[in-house]
């Protein structure tokens, strides 16, 4: 809070812009939300909440939002830059990943092993991601993970990872027919109208 008071002193003489993202912290110290909360309670502070379309285009953003939480209203949308394929085993996964790599896609790993922190800052035109049996949809239509015992949810990691794609996104769904069927339903929403 000492650093906050220094910044506030500066702000008396000139405009100061603060930015925070509690879901994408760089260091453990940033987990402390007291500074952000203190800023939010100050008089004459203007808050702006950014959308999820910071990096991705509208098509990818719409698909990712629908994937994270199934919409109650199915609005027509065409997703020409999204590919979803189903793999029955590891050999098929490898074949699909190699095929997408040949088309210029960069593979991203959804599970943490320390790699995500490095990947989180690297956007790419085309990304391919593996979704395995850990993912499922709950009764309210939210994508969930059976491996979310960590502080930072696997689904939240996946969300940030998917948003690294700038133009095209490919999903390889391994041995998870329920999630694959939902993905196909999202892709075909525009045909239902």
Residue ranges and their predicted role:
Residues 1-101, 109-193:
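Conserved helicase motor core of SF1/SF2 NTP-dependent helicases
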